Protein backbone atom coordinates (compact mmCIF):
# COMPACT_ATOMS: atom_id res chain seq x y z
CA UNK A 1 0.00 0.00 0.00
CA UNK A 2 1.09 3.58 -0.69
CA UNK A 3 1.26 6.30 1.95
CA UNK A 4 2.26 9.97 1.86
CA UNK A 5 4.15 10.97 5.00
CA UNK A 6 7.11 12.85 6.42
CA UNK A 7 9.96 12.15 8.83
CA UNK A 8 10.21 15.39 10.79
CA UNK A 9 7.95 18.38 11.47
CA UNK A 10 8.27 21.12 8.89
CA UNK A 11 6.99 24.49 7.76
CA UNK A 12 5.98 24.92 4.14
CA UNK A 13 8.67 27.51 3.48
CA UNK A 14 11.25 24.75 4.11
CA UNK A 15 10.04 23.06 0.93
CA UNK A 16 8.01 19.94 0.26
CA UNK A 17 9.11 17.24 2.71
CA UNK A 18 6.18 14.92 1.97
CA UNK A 19 7.37 11.59 0.56
CA UNK A 20 5.87 8.38 -0.81
CA UNK A 21 6.24 5.32 1.40
CA UNK A 22 5.26 1.71 0.82
CA UNK A 23 4.26 -0.82 3.45
CA UNK A 24 2.41 -4.10 3.69
CA UNK A 25 -1.38 -3.86 3.81
CA UNK A 26 -2.48 -4.32 7.46
CA UNK A 27 -4.92 -6.91 8.79
CA UNK A 28 -7.84 -5.64 10.91
CA UNK A 29 -8.14 -6.86 14.50
CA UNK A 30 -10.75 -6.42 17.24
CA UNK A 31 -13.29 -3.72 16.17
CA UNK A 32 -11.19 -2.36 13.29
CA UNK A 33 -12.18 -2.34 9.64
CA UNK A 34 -9.74 -2.12 6.73
CA UNK A 35 -10.83 0.54 4.25
CA UNK A 36 -9.59 0.95 0.69
CA UNK A 37 -9.52 4.74 0.56
CA UNK A 38 -11.12 6.46 -2.46
CA UNK A 39 -11.00 10.15 -1.48
CA UNK A 40 -9.75 12.28 1.39
CA UNK A 41 -10.38 15.83 2.56
CA UNK A 42 -7.62 18.02 3.96
CA UNK A 43 -8.36 20.08 7.08
CA UNK A 44 -6.62 22.88 9.01
CA UNK A 45 -5.76 20.32 11.70
CA UNK A 46 -3.52 18.60 9.12
CA UNK A 47 -1.43 21.75 8.79
CA UNK A 48 -1.07 22.02 12.57
CA UNK A 49 -0.21 18.34 13.03
CA UNK A 50 2.42 18.60 10.29
CA UNK A 51 4.39 20.99 12.50
CA UNK A 52 4.22 18.85 15.66
CA UNK A 53 6.83 16.41 16.95
CA UNK A 54 7.10 13.14 15.04
CA UNK A 55 7.30 10.28 17.55
CA UNK A 56 7.32 7.52 14.95
CA UNK A 57 8.43 8.10 11.36
CA UNK A 58 7.02 8.30 8.84
CA UNK A 59 4.09 10.34 10.13
CA UNK A 60 1.06 9.82 7.89
CA UNK A 61 -1.60 12.49 8.33
CA UNK A 62 -5.14 12.62 6.98
CA UNK A 63 -8.47 12.46 8.77
CA UNK A 64 -11.53 12.70 6.52
CA UNK A 65 -11.85 9.68 4.24
CA UNK A 66 -14.36 7.74 2.18
CA UNK A 67 -13.75 4.27 0.84
CA UNK A 68 -14.80 0.64 0.61
CA UNK A 69 -14.56 -1.85 3.46
CA UNK A 70 -12.17 -4.58 2.32
CA UNK A 71 -11.88 -6.65 5.52
CA UNK A 72 -13.23 -6.59 9.08
CA UNK A 73 -11.90 -7.53 12.51
CA UNK A 74 -13.49 -10.36 14.54
CA UNK A 75 -15.48 -8.01 16.78
CA UNK A 76 -16.99 -5.89 14.00
CA UNK A 77 -20.81 -5.93 13.90
CA UNK A 78 -21.77 -2.77 12.00
CA UNK A 79 -20.13 -3.31 8.60
CA UNK A 80 -19.38 -5.92 5.98
CA UNK A 81 -16.83 -6.07 3.15
CA UNK A 82 -18.08 -4.00 0.23
CA UNK A 83 -19.76 -1.30 2.33
CA UNK A 84 -18.92 2.27 1.29
CA UNK A 85 -18.12 4.21 4.45
CA UNK A 86 -16.87 7.61 5.59
CA UNK A 87 -15.18 8.79 8.79
CA UNK A 88 -12.76 11.27 10.35
CA UNK A 89 -10.23 8.94 11.97
CA UNK A 90 -7.95 9.77 14.90
CA UNK A 91 -4.57 11.54 15.18
CA UNK A 92 -3.05 8.73 17.25
CA UNK A 93 -3.28 6.26 14.34
CA UNK A 94 -2.04 6.15 10.75
CA UNK A 95 -4.02 8.70 8.77
CA UNK A 96 -5.98 8.62 5.54
CA UNK A 97 -3.21 9.95 3.28
CA UNK A 98 -2.83 6.36 2.10
CA UNK A 99 -4.46 3.80 -0.15
CA UNK A 100 -5.58 1.68 2.83
CA UNK A 101 -6.42 2.54 6.43
CA UNK A 102 -7.47 0.78 9.63
CA UNK A 103 -10.20 2.50 11.64
CA UNK A 104 -12.50 1.54 14.52
CA UNK A 105 -16.05 0.82 13.41
CA UNK A 106 -17.33 3.02 16.28
CA UNK A 107 -16.35 6.21 14.42
CA UNK A 108 -17.50 5.14 10.94
CA UNK A 109 -20.84 5.18 9.09
CA UNK A 110 -22.15 4.19 5.69
CA UNK A 111 -21.73 7.08 3.26
CA UNK A 112 -24.66 8.81 1.55
CA UNK A 113 -25.79 7.13 -1.68
CA UNK A 114 -27.01 10.24 -3.49
CA UNK A 115 -23.80 12.28 -3.72
CA UNK A 116 -20.32 11.57 -5.07
CA UNK A 117 -17.39 10.36 -2.98
CA UNK A 118 -15.58 13.67 -3.28
CA UNK A 119 -18.70 15.44 -2.00
CA UNK A 120 -19.37 13.07 0.90
CA UNK A 121 -15.79 13.17 2.16
CA UNK A 122 -16.17 16.88 2.95
CA UNK A 123 -18.49 16.08 5.85
CA UNK A 124 -17.12 13.75 8.58
CA UNK A 125 -14.64 15.83 10.59
CA UNK A 126 -16.50 19.11 10.33
CA UNK A 127 -19.88 17.43 10.75
CA UNK A 128 -18.88 15.54 13.90
CA UNK A 129 -17.33 18.73 15.29
CA UNK A 130 -20.59 20.61 14.77
CA UNK A 131 -22.80 17.77 16.05
CA UNK A 132 -20.76 17.45 19.24
CA UNK A 133 -20.99 21.21 19.74
CA UNK A 134 -24.74 21.45 19.24
CA UNK A 135 -25.91 18.24 20.89
CA UNK A 136 -23.25 17.36 23.48
CA UNK A 137 -22.20 20.86 24.52
CA UNK A 138 -25.10 23.22 23.78
CA UNK A 139 -27.52 20.33 24.37
CA UNK A 140 -30.05 21.51 21.82
CA UNK A 141 -33.03 19.24 21.23
CA UNK A 142 -33.17 16.69 18.43
CA UNK A 143 -36.74 17.96 17.94
CA UNK A 144 -36.44 21.12 15.79
CA UNK A 145 -39.67 22.62 17.15
CA UNK A 146 -38.18 22.72 20.64
CA UNK A 147 -35.27 24.89 19.42
CA UNK A 148 -37.40 27.54 17.71
CA UNK A 149 -36.72 30.95 19.23
CA UNK A 150 -33.14 30.08 20.14
CA UNK A 151 -30.20 31.56 18.24
CA UNK A 152 -26.56 30.86 17.50
CA UNK A 153 -23.73 33.08 16.28
CA UNK A 154 -21.21 31.14 14.17
CA UNK A 155 -17.96 33.04 13.72
CA UNK A 156 -16.43 32.31 10.29
CA UNK A 157 -19.45 30.79 8.61
CA UNK A 158 -17.74 30.06 5.27
CA UNK A 159 -15.06 27.74 6.62
CA UNK A 160 -15.40 23.97 6.62
CA UNK A 161 -16.89 23.74 10.12
CA UNK A 162 -19.00 26.88 9.77
CA UNK A 163 -20.47 25.66 6.48
CA UNK A 164 -21.91 22.44 7.90
CA UNK A 165 -22.64 23.95 11.34
CA UNK A 166 -24.95 26.49 9.70
CA UNK A 167 -26.88 23.72 7.96
CA UNK A 168 -27.18 21.63 11.13
CA UNK A 169 -28.35 24.59 13.19
CA UNK A 170 -31.01 25.47 10.61
CA UNK A 171 -32.12 21.84 10.27
CA UNK A 172 -32.73 21.68 14.01
CA UNK A 173 -34.67 24.93 14.34
CA UNK A 174 -32.14 27.56 15.41
CA UNK A 175 -31.89 31.10 14.08
CA UNK A 176 -28.40 31.35 12.57
CA UNK A 177 -26.20 34.43 12.48
CA UNK A 178 -22.84 33.90 10.79
CA UNK A 179 -19.88 36.07 9.90
CA UNK A 180 -17.88 36.56 6.71
CA UNK A 181 -15.82 39.36 5.18
CA UNK A 182 -15.92 39.04 1.39
CA UNK A 183 -18.77 39.03 -1.11
CA UNK A 184 -18.11 35.41 -2.09
CA UNK A 185 -17.98 34.22 1.52
CA UNK A 186 -21.13 36.15 2.39
CA UNK A 187 -22.94 34.54 -0.54
CA UNK A 188 -21.66 31.12 0.53
CA UNK A 189 -22.98 31.62 4.07
CA UNK A 190 -26.38 32.56 2.64
CA UNK A 191 -26.29 29.45 0.44
CA UNK A 192 -25.63 27.34 3.56
CA UNK A 193 -28.79 28.80 5.10
CA UNK A 194 -27.68 31.62 7.39
CA UNK A 195 -30.46 34.01 8.40
CA UNK A 196 -28.08 36.94 8.92
CA UNK A 197 -24.47 37.38 7.76
CA UNK A 198 -22.29 39.99 9.50
CA UNK A 199 -18.82 41.27 8.62
CA UNK A 200 -16.28 39.86 11.10
CA UNK A 201 -13.68 42.43 10.07
CA UNK A 202 -15.91 45.15 11.47
CA UNK A 203 -17.27 45.67 15.00
CA UNK A 204 -19.74 42.84 15.63
CA UNK A 205 -21.24 44.50 18.72
CA UNK A 206 -22.03 47.61 16.69
CA UNK A 207 -23.56 45.52 13.90
CA UNK A 208 -25.78 43.70 16.41
CA UNK A 209 -27.05 47.06 17.69
CA UNK A 210 -27.52 48.59 14.23
CA UNK A 211 -29.50 45.58 13.00
CA UNK A 212 -31.34 45.25 16.34
CA UNK A 213 -30.22 41.63 16.72
CA UNK A 214 -30.96 40.25 20.22
CA UNK A 215 -28.20 38.64 22.26
CA UNK A 216 -27.76 35.00 21.27
CA UNK A 217 -28.17 31.77 23.26
CA UNK A 218 -25.06 30.14 21.79
CA UNK A 219 -21.83 31.20 20.11
CA UNK A 220 -19.69 28.80 18.08
CA UNK A 221 -16.24 30.27 17.39
CA UNK A 222 -14.35 28.60 14.55
CA UNK A 223 -11.66 31.25 14.07
CA UNK A 224 -9.23 33.18 16.33
CA UNK A 225 -10.71 32.82 19.80
CA UNK A 226 -8.40 35.49 21.24
CA UNK A 227 -9.60 38.12 18.77
CA UNK A 228 -13.29 37.56 19.51
CA UNK A 229 -13.20 36.58 23.19
CA UNK A 230 -14.45 39.87 24.67
CA UNK A 231 -16.87 40.40 21.79
CA UNK A 232 -18.44 36.98 22.39
CA UNK A 233 -18.93 37.80 26.07
CA UNK A 234 -20.82 40.96 25.07
CA UNK A 235 -23.04 39.20 22.51
CA UNK A 236 -24.06 36.13 24.54
CA UNK A 237 -27.19 36.05 26.69
CA UNK A 238 -26.90 35.58 30.46
CA UNK A 239 -26.50 31.82 31.14
CA UNK A 240 -25.44 31.39 27.51
CA UNK A 241 -22.87 28.95 26.16
CA UNK A 242 -19.75 29.70 24.09
CA UNK A 243 -17.79 26.93 22.38
CA UNK A 244 -14.59 27.28 20.40
CA UNK A 245 -12.52 24.91 18.30
CA UNK A 246 -9.51 27.24 18.25
CA UNK A 247 -7.02 27.13 21.14
CA UNK A 248 -6.02 30.34 22.89
CA UNK A 249 -2.66 31.84 21.99
CA UNK A 250 -2.85 34.44 24.75
CA UNK A 251 -3.96 34.47 28.39
CA UNK A 252 -7.63 35.43 28.76
CA UNK A 253 -9.63 36.51 31.81
CA UNK A 254 -12.01 33.67 32.70
CA UNK A 255 -13.51 35.89 35.42
CA UNK A 256 -15.05 37.94 32.61
CA UNK A 257 -17.50 35.05 32.11
CA UNK A 258 -18.83 35.30 35.68
CA UNK A 259 -21.19 38.29 35.48
CA UNK A 260 -23.44 36.54 32.93
CA UNK A 261 -22.69 33.04 34.28
CA UNK A 262 -21.44 32.05 30.83
CA UNK A 263 -20.35 28.48 30.12
CA UNK A 264 -17.20 28.32 27.98
CA UNK A 265 -16.14 25.04 26.34
CA UNK A 266 -13.44 23.78 24.00
CA UNK A 267 -14.62 21.29 21.36
CA UNK A 268 -12.13 18.69 20.13
CA UNK A 269 -13.76 15.94 18.12
CA UNK A 270 -10.72 13.68 18.43
CA UNK A 271 -11.13 13.40 22.22
CA UNK A 272 -13.44 10.40 21.88
CA UNK A 273 -11.28 8.26 19.55
CA UNK A 274 -7.97 9.23 21.19
CA UNK A 275 -9.21 8.21 24.64
CA UNK A 276 -11.60 5.51 23.40
CA UNK A 277 -14.34 6.90 25.61
CA UNK A 278 -17.28 4.62 26.47
CA UNK A 279 -19.55 6.76 24.28
CA UNK A 280 -17.25 6.75 21.23
CA UNK A 281 -20.13 5.17 19.26
CA UNK A 282 -21.76 8.62 19.25
CA UNK A 283 -19.53 9.55 16.31
CA UNK A 284 -20.97 6.64 14.34
CA UNK A 285 -24.46 7.86 15.26
CA UNK A 286 -23.74 11.46 14.28
CA UNK A 287 -22.35 10.35 10.91
CA UNK A 288 -25.48 8.24 10.40
CA UNK A 289 -27.59 11.35 10.98
CA UNK A 290 -25.48 13.29 8.49
CA UNK A 291 -26.05 10.55 5.89
CA UNK A 292 -29.79 10.60 6.58
CA UNK A 293 -29.98 14.38 6.20
CA UNK A 294 -27.89 14.39 3.02
CA UNK A 295 -30.10 11.71 1.47
CA UNK A 296 -33.27 13.58 2.49
CA UNK A 297 -31.98 16.85 1.02
CA UNK A 298 -31.65 18.76 4.30
CA UNK A 299 -27.86 19.08 4.05
CA UNK A 300 -25.59 19.75 1.10
CA UNK A 301 -21.89 18.85 0.81
CA UNK A 302 -19.30 21.58 1.25
CA UNK A 303 -16.61 20.54 -1.27
CA UNK A 304 -15.33 23.48 -3.33
CA UNK A 305 -11.96 22.23 -4.67
CA UNK A 306 -10.86 18.78 -5.87
CA UNK A 307 -7.32 17.58 -6.68
CA UNK A 308 -6.81 14.39 -8.68
CA UNK A 309 -4.26 11.92 -7.33
CA UNK A 310 -2.65 11.36 -3.93
CA UNK A 311 0.90 12.67 -4.33
CA UNK A 312 3.42 14.69 -2.30
CA UNK A 313 2.88 17.65 -4.63
CA UNK A 314 -0.92 17.66 -4.33
CA UNK A 315 -0.72 17.32 -0.56
CA UNK A 316 1.79 20.17 -0.35
CA UNK A 317 -0.43 22.39 -2.51
CA UNK A 318 -3.43 21.54 -0.34
CA UNK A 319 -1.56 22.59 2.80
CA UNK A 320 -0.49 25.82 1.07
CA UNK A 321 -4.10 26.69 0.27
CA UNK A 322 -5.31 25.96 3.79
CA UNK A 323 -2.57 28.01 5.41
CA UNK A 324 -3.67 31.06 3.41
CA UNK A 325 -6.84 30.93 5.57
CA UNK A 326 -9.08 32.01 2.72
CA UNK A 327 -10.67 28.65 1.87
CA UNK A 328 -14.40 28.47 1.33
CA UNK A 329 -15.79 25.05 2.20
CA UNK A 330 -13.57 21.98 1.86
CA UNK A 331 -10.66 20.76 -0.29
CA UNK A 332 -10.69 17.13 -1.46
CA UNK A 333 -8.08 14.83 -3.01
CA UNK A 334 -9.23 11.82 -5.02
CA UNK A 335 -6.86 8.90 -4.48
UniProtKB/Swiss-Prot annotation:
Pfam family, one: ADH_N
SUPFAM superfamilies according to UniProt: GroES-like (SSF50129), NAD(P)-binding Rossmann-fold domains (SSF51735)
Keyword Metal-binding: yes
Record's keyword terms, sorted: Metal-binding, Oxidoreductase, Zinc
Superkingdom of origin: Bacteria
Sample GO molecular function, one term: oxidoreductase activity
Family designation: Belongs to the zinc-containing alcohol dehydrogenase family. Quinone oxidoreductase subfamily.
Matches recorded under PANTHER family: ALCOHOL DEHYDROGENASE RELATED, RETICULON-4-INTERACTING PROTEIN 1, MITOCHONDRIAL
Name of the protein in its database record: Zinc-type alcohol dehydrogenase-like protein SAR2277
Annotated organism of origin: Staphylococcus aureus (strain MRSA252)
Amino acid sequence: MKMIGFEKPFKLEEGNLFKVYEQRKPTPENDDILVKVNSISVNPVDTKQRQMEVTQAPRVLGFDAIGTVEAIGPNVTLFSPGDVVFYAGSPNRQGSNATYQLVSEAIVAKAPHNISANEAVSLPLTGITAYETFFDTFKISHNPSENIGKSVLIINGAGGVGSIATQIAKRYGLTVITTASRQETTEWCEKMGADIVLNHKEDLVRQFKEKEIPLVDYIFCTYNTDLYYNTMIELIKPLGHITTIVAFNEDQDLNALKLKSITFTHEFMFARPIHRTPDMIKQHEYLEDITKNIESGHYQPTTTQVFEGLSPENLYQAHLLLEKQSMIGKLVINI
